[in-house]
Amino acid sequence: MSDSQQSITVLEELFRKLETATSETREGISSELSSFLNGNIIEHDVPEVFFDEFQKAIQSKQKALNTLGAVAYIANETNLSPSVEPYIVATVPSVCSKAGSKDNDVQLAATKALKAIASAVNPVAVKALLPHLIHSLETSNKWKEKVAVLEVISVLVDAAKEQIALRMPELIPVLSESMWDTKKGVKEAATTTITKATETVDNKDIERFIPKLIECIANPNEVPETVHLLGATTFVAEVTPATLSIMVPLLSRGLAERETSIKRKAAVIIDNMCKLVEDPQVVAPFLGKLLPGLKNNFATIADPEAREVTLKALKTLRRVGNVGEDDVLPEISHAGDVSTTLGVIKELLEPEKVAPRFTIVVEYIAAIAANLIDERIIDQQTWFTHVTPYMTIFLHEKTAKEILDDFRKRAVDNIPVGPNFQDEEDEGEDLCNCEFSLAYGAKILLNKTQLRLKRGRRYGLCGPNGAGKSTLMRSIANGQVDGFPTQDECRTVYVEHDIDNTHSDMSVLDFVYSGNVGTKDVITSKLKEFGFSDEMIEMPIASLSGGWKMKLALARAVLKDADILLLDEPTNHLDTVNVEWLVNYLNTCGITSVIVSHDSGFLDKVCQYIIHYEGLKLRKYKGNLSEFVQKCPTAQSYYELGASDLEFQFPTPGYLEGVKTKQKAIVKVSNMTFQYPGTTKPQVSDVTFQCSLSSRIAVIGPNGAGKSTLINVLTGELLPTSGEVYTHENCRIAYIKQHAFAHIESHLDKTPSEYIQWRFQTGEDRETMDRANRQINENDAEAMNKIFKIEGTPRRVAGIHSRRKFKNTYEYECSFLLGENIGMKSERWVPMMSVDNAWLPRGELIESHSKMVAEIDMKEALASGQFRALTRKEIELHCAMLGLDSELVSHSRIRGLSGGQKVKLVLAACTWQRPHLIVLDEPTNYLDRDSLGALSKALKAFEGGVIIITHSAEFTKNLTDEVWAVKDGKMTPSGHNWVAGQGAGPRIEKKEEEGDKFDAMGNKINSGKKKSKLSSAELRKKKKERMKKKKEMGDEYVSSDEDF
């Protein structure tokens, strides 16, 4: 008897024993059968007949239990034989059907067998196994079968995590449907399985939101909130099929929501995520769900701005998915389809005349190959490792490898290939060759881009304003760029002229020496090389100009033995001579440099390469700036001189009645002293100052000197212990605290637009309503008991209701309480009727009712139409002046804003009411260099007064004229030009507001032109016409305003 015939005989005997086995002998026979099958059976003699009988036994009621136990044993074998694996996977549909059996023992045995198969199968053969499980979920009406299959999928996720990640687009819809099953057990199992499956989503941007995304599948009411949460997310990680499979259900529902804001936010997320898709084939399966929703919204949304955002997302989706304007969806690649690879392998095997009994094995090989194509694994050795063991079942190894290599090449040729930009080859030592992504706040700057720097080369870093050039430089210097060499491997120094103010009193030599860069002799020698004289080396840093500070920073970097210099706008503070010196130095020092500059002439003279921002990538061009512009003409506009990355603008202050010049005091403090209760001495004492629209004041002094206390009294946050504080009735002060975020900390879940609407919804600034100068205290209550003698009766003021002009001041309409039996035990005060209201002059009221008068002044100012409407568009326009775009203002929650964006929001909110004075407490603490430059320019151009508390002389040097030096509670002013009356200078005329005017509630104010007075001749003419009409019409005549 031959070996093969003997094997078949043994199998038949074992199978017969298995059929008749009892519960006591079942395990032993199953184990023996498993060992024999996975042993040394001749590959060409695959026991086809045995497995046919095996399949029938699984379906049999009498034999199922024993056979399922054997399946588990065969699959649990440590080394599952390649000749057995395809056949054992082929039993899965039959085993699945038994997992729903009413017989509990059979159901448990089937579940155990399925889990054993899922654990044992080659991970790359997942495309052979998973379709069976999905088909069972889709077609079965047995809830136990569904629960078992869901548990098996969880096991398969652990066994083949990378492969399941690629199958998520077909897996998630089926699991989602199971989550809506009517059976509670299926729902729970589906939720557990989909949670397990999402472990394959390797995307740091969304991983913390995955529980919410799963919750949205089960509960669609959660969609709006989840879209809001994701809308504040910065997407920087590559978007894969697994990521889209879990995101697209949410986004497609978001596009179909009723609220326009949710539709818009969903479009923003689609736009941001699609930019991170590397391969059009990744997004292709999802185009059918996203494209129609975006098109429909673009056609039906009424809000123009939301339609514009939707159109932007639509364009991005079309570009990434290679969709034409006709919106015909491109064909999805079938390179990784099992049917495609099966066709190729069958064609190659045709000359070998492979027997029909190996069909299951050939189909299994096609499934493995399809998975390798999906994973984009194309190297020969990996294909040999995964596929050869199955090919040698019916071919000799040499023939198998020859056919397999041909199979690999033909299968790989079917993969669609996108454009590939190779870095220009260049000889030299690599200092850096890394791939990374970069974001700032909620904005993606770079996505999976390469940066390669060679020793001794000079690179110009170029891109449009806001592309993130300085952010990239700072990120490299701070070690935040993935893959960039550490300081131990490659010393990188960020050269900036803004030397920290804490070192301003140190000498130049001591400052460089404090950086541990060498001995003082070495440092002195190097500084002299850079042009420093002996006298300058001993000078304090504060006395150096910006240009010399730049040279000092460069000398310190060179002494640190830098391999790479990062230069951010190095020519900003240099004169022509020093620019030429810097050009010569960089060209001859041999140090690699990366330069950001708007000086095109400087870049032309220095750079050997231009690194340019293109579509979230860095692309390198050989040559200087002129050569680069020839290759990329559209880049010319980026590098015009004077280009500014950031600009702020403050609104023009409202008109102040009685203030004819900018020199007239609008805030005046005389002999003011303030002492906190319980302290032994005043915090500030005997302080006198005044502020006008032309004030540019720097408040300086050591910590604890009383600067902030002084400002708090000025702004009304605190009331003085003694002294006088006068503020113009309609003067508005914007105060940005040292801890700027204090203004918005309790509103993080609002959008910036909603925050501003909340803050000013009554017309008043709700942030200032708790200021001490607006709260009625005990002294105020006592003063308000003052008795006025009016029309012979004693009265107390009950309320103040309106204001009108009276000579050079104002008078106020007051309601009263009438006094009866004053001074007696039966004394009482009775409210009087409104007909008894009377007008009292301001000077008389202010002594006892100053805070009530201030409230009326505020309300009158609000009614004057000097405030804009609290509409979304108006708020967006205002915030745009402070560098916040409409996307952030109306559609992003404050919680998701970066630190710099939050500060801009605080600036925007504080200046909403067009303040006359802007007070900033330590702005350099919370604004970066770019924003400080923009703020400095805006404050210079501001038409109101500016008061700044700061330690930074650099910031205030060219901005302020007046200095208040605070020390030990005393304030010494200098540079001031205080005047008693209106003062000199050009007169301020009240300007007529252009365009429509609104009150604080958004109601349009119709301000008609004032009628001119008629002359006596015109009046006589009007009278004659009136008499003529009366005579002609008789009793029918009715006069009108036009007749007079």
From Swiss-Prot:
Pathway per the UniProt entry: Protein biosynthesis; polypeptide chain elongation
UniProt note: phenotype after gene disruption: Decreases translation of proteins required for detoxification of reactive oxygen species. Sensitive to hydrogen peroxide. Increases GRX1 mRNA level during vegetative growth. Normal vegetative cell population growth on glucose, galactose, and glycerol carbon sources, at high temperature, and at standard temperature. Normal mating and sporulation.
Positions of ADP binding: 42, 44, 83, 392, 396-397, 703, 922, 925, 951
Gene3D superfamilies to which the protein is assigned, alphabetical: 1.20.1390.20, 2.40.50.990, Leucine-rich Repeat Variant, P-loop containing nucleotide triphosphate hydrolases
GO molecular function annotation: ATP binding; ATP hydrolysis activity; RNA binding; translation elongation factor activity
Chief subcellular location: cytoplasm
Positions with biased composition (Basic and acidic residues): 987-999
This enzyme's EC code(s): 3.6.4.-
Location of Phosphoserine modifications: 974, 1039-1040
Annotated region (Disordered), positions in chain: 975-1044
N6,N6,N6-trimethyllysine PTM sites in chain numbering: 187, 196, 789
Modified residues annotated as Phosphothreonine in this record: 972
Alphabetical keyword list: Acetylation, ATP-binding, Cytoplasm, Elongation factor, Hydrolase, Methylation, Nucleotide-binding, Phosphoprotein, Protein biosynthesis, Repeat, RNA-binding
Enzyme class: hydrolase
Top-level taxonomic group: Eukaryota
HEAT repeat ranges, renumbered to this chain: 5-42, 86-123, 124-162, 166-203, 205-241, 242-279, 285-323
Subcellular location as annotated: Cytoplasm
One Gene Ontology term, aspect cellular component: cytosolic ribosome
ABC transporter domain ranges (all copies): 426-641, 667-993
Induction profile: Increases in mild (0.5 mM) hydrogen peroxide stress, and decreases in stronger (1 mM) hydrogen peroxide stress.
Disulfide bonds: none
Similarity section: Belongs to the ABC transporter superfamily. ABCF family. EF3 subfamily.
Subunit structure: Monomer.
Protein name: Elongation factor 3B
Protein source organism: Saccharomyces cerevisiae (strain ATCC 204508 / S288c) (Baker's yeast)
